């Protein structure tokens, strides 16, 4: 399938620079601190209104009218609503699939954030913190989440594939990006121990993720992985017969 699509950023995963009004009255720079900086009822109201208005069925119709055939939808690790104080958004993704299938579009689900963050970026959920790979319980949670997404959507006509993890940061890029100076952590104590993800760990995680997802996704659905900003290191990865339709 030749992909000609658009990314629906800032709908289900917030990015302050795209919707600064959501952050009015707070010092929060990312989605982790937003609900901790507002009364719960105010936070919930802002999020629910944003999600209902930012992307609608009309957008899918417009995307189709432009001759595109796919949308990439970033989703957060709390999509199923099981990570308080965040509000889940599985209903919105369900709607997106209904709209996509109505207008003959394909969806790439992109797991954009994980607990503890995979990169320390503001769009990774919490600025200046990158500890996900060092927290076994968070890694296991992520595998379980990917399996749940694959089980729910794996056989949907509108699914192009699932991206395992957005922009994990590996050794070469950690220093180049100067993460903790570019994205200042709010809580220095929480940020202690942050660091890049090794390629060895990332390869192992991708293989584990492929296997749990493929149990629920037929081979015509793609498993997509990010190169960690180090494209050359993946030349011979997943070349074995076991791995089908990997992007």
Feature map (PLM): residue ranges:
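N-terminal carbohydrate-binding accessory modules
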Residues: 1-68
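Short, solvent-exposed loop/turn segments at secondary-structure junctions
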Residues: 79-82, 232-233
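Active-site region of glycoside hydrolase catalytic domains
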Residues: 2-5, 16, 28, 117-247
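An active-site-proximal structural segment forming one wall of the substrate-binding cleft
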Residues: 44-71, 81, 85-113, 123-164, ...
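A cross-domain feature marking catalytic cores of carbohydrate-active enzymes
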Residues: 6-10, 73-77, 109-113, 163-166, ...
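A short alpha-helix capping/helix-coil boundary motif
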Residues: 37-40, 73-77, 128-129, 188-190
């Amino acid at each position: 399938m030749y992909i000609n699509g658009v990314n629906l950023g800032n709908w289900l995963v917030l990015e302050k620079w795209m919707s600064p009004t959501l952050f009015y009255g707070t010092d929060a720079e990312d989605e982790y601190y937003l609900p901790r900086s507002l009364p719960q009822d105010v936070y919930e109201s802002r999020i629910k209104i944003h999600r209902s208005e930012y992307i609608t069925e009309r957008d899918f119709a417009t995307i189709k009218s432009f001759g595109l055939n796919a949308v990439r939808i970033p989703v957060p690790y709390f999509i199923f609503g099981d990570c308080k104080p965040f509000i889940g958004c599985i209903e919105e993704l369900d709607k997106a699939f209904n709209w996509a299938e109505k207008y003959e579009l394909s969806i790439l689900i992109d797991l954009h954030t994980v607990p503890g963050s995979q990169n320390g970026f503001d769009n990774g959920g919490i600025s200046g913190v990158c500890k996900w790979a060092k927290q076994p319980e968070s890694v296991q949670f992520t595998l379980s989440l990917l399996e749940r997404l694959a089980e729910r959507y794996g056989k949907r006509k509108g699914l192009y594939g699932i991206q395992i993890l957005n922009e994990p940061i590996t050794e070469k890029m950690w220093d180049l990006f100067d993460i903790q100076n570019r994205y200042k952590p709010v809580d220095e104590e929480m940020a202690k121990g942050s660091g890049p993800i090794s390629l060895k760990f990332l390869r192992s995680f991708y293989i584990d993720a492929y296997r749990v997802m493929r149990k629920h996704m037929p081979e015509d659905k793609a498993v997509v992985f990010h190169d960690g900003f180090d494209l050359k290191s993946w030349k011979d990865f997943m070349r074995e017969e076991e791995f089908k339709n990997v992007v």
